[in-house]
Design a protein with these regions (language model features):
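Short active-site-adjacent helix-start/loop capping segments
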Residues: 21-23, 56-59
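DPxDG-like acidic metal-binding loop motif
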Residues: 58-84
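C-terminal nucleotide
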Residues: 3-42, 51, 74-80, 89-102, ...
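Glycine/charged-rich beta-loop-alpha catalytic/anionic-binding loops adjacent to active sites
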Residues: 44-56
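Conserved glycine-rich beta-strand-loop-beta hairpin in the small C-terminal domain of fold type I
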Residues: 236
Length: 265
């Protein structure tokens, strides 16, 4: 898959030595991150302050952004070096093993590396950093009133994959092929083909999952304006692949009229 981090939507954390674990504002997610870090790396007690501008529950990687930010702050304080792959794995373990949240590596790999990343998963998987300047104009939009728990979406897919459901397995393979086509289009600077891969990816998702009509409405509005569209994650936010900046401005206005928060890239 392809993913890009957004500077305008990010999480920050600050860590300092303390007698006992302290987190401000209180957060089970942050506490679990500090505890896991301390256990894995035998680190002393720490106090952590954190903040985020990432909307939660709309498929923009809000929880994983917080975990990665806290891990970075802890690494800086305790002078620990974690490569991006290890940081992503640790972040995933915190959510899945410690908190019982259904999740995958995707968001965590993208956030641990930063920038534009192409990801291959499974046997022989690899992560490739690409130049963000290859991207065409994009618009990211989300509906705060249509948030949902991403774990619920992931849990359904994970259950079917474990059961080796033929339709689900075939769909995931198709998504992987579409992602490779998107990478090729990006490198060739074929933005029209890139937009089509966004549409193709969404169409596969729609076959595999029962989607919230409020989220689908965003995709359909973008497509009606001639841009490619896909979910950014589990649902609630979309990314529009636009022809140029003027086209992006038109798409952003239309999505704002639906009550969306928008961010143009």
């Amino acid at each position: 898959m392809l993913a890009v981090t957004l500077d305008a939507l990010s999480a920050e954390a600050f860590a300092r030595p303390a007698q006992t674990l302290a987190v401000e504002p209180a957060s089970e997610l942050v506490e679990a991150t500090v505890r896991r870090f301390s256990m894995e790396l035998d680190a002393a007690a720490t106090a952590v302050q954190w903040r985020t501008s990432v909307p939660r529950g709309v498929g923009l990687g809000g929880s994983s952004a917080i975990v990665i930010a806290v891990l970075r702050a802890l690494c800086e304080l305790h002078r620990v070096a974690l490569d991006p792959a290890r940081m992503a794995e640790l972040a995933l373990a915190i959510e899945t093993e410690d908190l019982g949240i259904a999740a995958g590596l995707q968001d965590r790999v993208a956030q641990a590396h930063g920038g534009l990343v192409f990801m291959e998963f499974g046997d022989g998987g690899a992560y490739e950093q690409l130049a963000p300047k290859l991207l065409p104009p994009l618009v990211v939009a989300w509906r705060a009133d249509a948030a949902q728990d991403s774990g619920d979406v992931h849990a359904s897919l994970r259950t079917r994959l474990k059961a080796e459901d033929a339709t689900t397995v075939a769909g995931m393979k198709e998504l992987a092929e579409i992602a490779r086509a998107a990478r090729a289009a990006l490198i060739a600077e074929d933005h029209e083909r890139l937009a089509r891969t966004a549409d193709e990816s969404f169409d596969v998702r729609r076959r595999l999952l029962t989607l919230d009509p409020r989220h689908v409405e965003l995709v359909e509005r973008v497509r009606a304006l001639g841009a490619g569209a896909n979910y950014t994650g589990s649902g609630g936010a979309v990314v529009a692949v636009c022809r140029d900046q003027a086209h992006a401005a038109t798409v952003a206005r239309a999505l704002a009229q639906l009550g969306c928060g928008t961010l143009a890239m």
